């Protein structure tokens, strides 16, 4: 890996304020082609990407998300787990492929495919000088997003991505990640609780200092406090039902 690519990836951070400058069609096509170059399990290509250009559709998706940058960006992509085309093949072949793509394994395979495509696009966009932010908030109301985007059975909207030129007011920076030794295990998982807690305490201090410096003392919470707040909430408890309605996790 060249130092350029390494540094580009290391400098990644979410951008939430964009200039009012739409991406051109050629740029959009290049980003999608970069995404399609990602690895795909067994050549299944279990994804579709919806480019949302209609302001009225973006506005409706913003209502679901609650985030202004769903509307105010250079371009909005929605990444869809897609077995609909495989279902069409199955209807002709009559080989009962639904047993596979309607399973939990099928869901995992498809979700991984979509994530790889999206990350390829994110890196390509940042290489072009654009900023990006992922939008998991589109899952706040999956049924409504499916209706807005006219999604058929055997498809599922996983997340979105807003792309564009960062606003002059944008001052984001990379957040400190967990230490290498905390997430990289040699040969077997190291579940030593004492060591893990010790490393987390040190990391919590790093994160707290990061927020304190960036916000001039307004925020001082650490990583453990953040995940306690986030994972302590009961959110999107309808997800299993919505997945089943779309044809997934049937077995």
UniProtKB/Swiss-Prot annotation:
This protein's cofactor list reads:
FMN
Q: Does the keyword Mitochondrion apply?
A: no
**Annotated InterPro entries:** Flavin_OxRdtase_Frp (IPR016446), Nitroreductase (IPR029479), Nitroreductase-like (IPR000415)
Q: What is its EC number?
A: 1.6.-.-
Q: Which UniProt keywords apply?
A: Flavoprotein, FMN, NADP, Oxidoreductase
Keyword Metal-binding listed? The answer is: no
Give GO terms: molecular function aspect only. Answer: oxidoreductase activity
Superkingdom to which the source organism belongs = Bacteria
Q: What class of enzyme is it?
A: oxidoreductase
SUPFAM superfamilies in the record = FMN-dependent nitroreductase-like (SSF55469)
Family designation = Belongs to the flavin oxidoreductase frp family.
What does the UniProt function comment say about this protein? Reduces FMN, organic nitro compounds and disulfide DTNB. Involved in maintenance of the cellular redox state and the disulfide stress response.
User: In its UniProt entry, what is this protein called?
Assistant: NADPH-dependent oxidoreductase
Organism annotation? Staphylococcus epidermidis (strain ATCC 35984 / DSM 28319 / BCRC 17069 / CCUG 31568 / BM 3577 / RP62A)
Q: What gene name is given for the protein in this entry?
A: nfrA
